[in-house]
Design a protein with these regions (language model features):
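C-terminal and inter-domain tail/linker signature
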Residues: 1-139
């Protein structure tokens, strides 16, 4: 199963880096739920995931995710990503700063029948907000 999951994660990374709706429907179950820090309620299905990507791309039109490492157990994956992009649009109400970001994210996925059915997304929003100048550097 771990080779299958690795292939699915590769498809997922291609999906998030392109926001391709066809790939969304291939890799994301319509019954999927996504827990993200920017929404009080879980997002659902491919449409929910596309809305997350839309929010990110509205603030960082060139954003790209690099999958750094995974830990796979049965049908579950812990994944560490690096997100990079330029803050060239409004993000969470913060106007474009023109600053580049490089932010870590740790996400947890569950797969069923070759598709994502659950994700807990944990991007380092504190670091992101500091990097775009919305918060002062700490320390």
């Amino acid at each position: 199963m771990s080779n299958e999951i690795k292939e699915l994660m590769s498809t997922f990374v291609k999906f998030i880096n392109t926001a391709d709706e066809k790939l969304a429907n291939e890799i994301v179950s319509q019954k999927a739920v996504f827990f993200v820090p920017t929404s009080p309620e879980p997002l659902k299905g491919a449409e929910g995931y596309m809305s997350v990507l839309g929010m990110m791309r509205s603030g960082f039109s060139d954003i790209q995710w690099t999958l750094e490492e995974t830990v796979i157990e049965d049908n579950r994956v812990a994944a560490r990503f690096t997100m990079k992009g330029t803050h060239n649009g409004t993000f969470m109400g913060i106007p474009a700063s023109g600053k580049n970001i490089s932010v870590q994210a740790t996400n947890f996925y569950e797969f069923e029948d070759g598709k994502i059915v659950k994700e807990y997304g944990q991007p380092d929003l504190l670091s992101l907000l500091i990097q775009i100048g919305a918060l002062p550097h700490l320390g």
